[in-house]
Amino acid sequence: LARCDFNPVEQAPAELKQGDFRDLAQVITALELGVCSAALKKALLEKAQTQKAPVLGVTGTGGSGKSSLTDELVRRFRLDQDERLKIAILAVDPSRRKTGGALLGDRIRMNAIHGDKVFMRSFATRASGAEIAACLPEAIAAARAAGFDLVIVETSGIGQGDAAIVPLVDVPMYVMTPEFGAASQLEKIDMLDFADFVA
């Protein structure tokens, strides 16, 4: 167990090469661990601003089918675009407050992510206190800077008053189940005011 406790990134890459999944993974890990240099962060943000890749945010209650929907969207994008579209998926799962652990299980539901044009990265919320990881804004910038055509961000399950994904994405999507309770409950769901799509 002691041997498992090590820093996977001793030093962040000095730059991010477009199309290099390993570089992107290392940069995101460095961002997550807080060991990314200020110069690289600045370069990522500047590069991301020159890219036109849209960012789709998929959010909703736990168990509503966010991962299954994300997988289906990726499958259809791949088929529709004849595998030309480069897609990055950034998926967030909740950390358990008592143990600090997280089951990064979004990928269990995803079958269409295997291919050389699809990058998938799991995150834990850690101590962010929200449905997103603290490093997510910078990770989105890194994915855009890496030259992807589409970035899909999936949050962990949310409650009625949560909408942290909205300022980070271009197109927010809310996924819900038909068992939401009385009709008056719909008036309490903050994401319904912001979502461009409801599934």
Which functions belong to the PLM regions below?
Residues 59-62:
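Residues at the beta-strand->loop junction immediately N-terminal to the Walker
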Residues 13, 123-125, 199:
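Short hinge/gating elements
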Residues 17-20, 113, 165, 188:
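Generic alpha-helical segment signature
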Residues 155-159, 168-185, 192-199:
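Conserved Switch II/interswitch segment of TRAFAC-class P-loop GTPases
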